[in-house]
Each structure stands twice: as C-alpha cells, then as structure tokens.
Amino acid sequence: MEYNKNGQILREFYARHDLTDCFERDNAYLESAFDEINRIWFDNLCKIDEVNYLMIAEAPLWGKSKSYIYNPATPFTQFFQKSDLEYVLNTKIRDKAEFIDRCNQIGLLIIDISPFALNTEDTIINYRGKSKQNPYGITKREYRLLIQETLPTFFDCKIEK
C-alpha cells in the first residue's frame, strides 16, 4: 500500500484550508507514521488465520509514543480497552501482547478508516472539533469529506487484502 495518493489528497485538503505552509512538515510525519503503522498492521494480519470479526477504527494518534492498538510496546488506548475484551471472552488478560494475541486467535481484525495519524502535537490539523481553542480542528463535514476522498486509496485497499 502506497502513501503517495493519500498524500496528494492531503496536500489538496491543506491547500483548500490555506495551510500549505505547514504541509511539508506534517506530511513528513504522516508518511513516516503511515509506513510504520501499515508495517505493524500487515505483520499482525499475517498472524490471523481467518478473519471472523471486523472492527473499524478512526486512525491511531501515533505520535512520539507510537500509540497504536497493534503496538504491544505502548499502553492500551481509549479506543479498545483490555477490560472490554476480558468481558467478552470471560477471561483475564495479562498485558497488551496477550490482548493482541487473543484478538488474533478469535479472528478479530481492526482496520483504520483513515490513513492519517493526525494529532495535536505533530500536525497542524487534528481530529478534535474546530473551536476557538482548537482553530485547526476539522469539522465533522470536513472529516467525512477527507475520509470519503481516501476510501479508494486506503480503506478499500485494506479490505481487499
């Protein structure tokens, strides 16, 4: 899976919002995050014998800590808590590595809907709503449009795998 088409969509998004001055810096981070996240995701996909359940997620915040559901070296995220899986499986789970293992064993695959690991630290735009305190947040409409534009170049490619 290549970043280039997604990067072009993002370049156009930044241009529409008069943020071209910030694009190169943000894009360098986003492309690097994209590559690492997808490497981890594909490595994990190979550990699932058969996909029985599909969970669609927004996108990881990633950042310096490399926070991601499939990264065993990072803490659990708000997105999917260990206690949720423990409840469903009626069992105790020791740590994140075991959590990922259990997801793989039951055939649970998590797919991000967006290729962009936007956050308030590494990118000028972010997934938080636009407000006076957060002028570079994107509105729900802008978010939907960005997702819609990247569906064929990102999400659909993962579904086909």
Task: Place the predicted regions along the sequence by residue.
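A polyanion-binding, active-site-adjacent surface
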Residues: 2-161
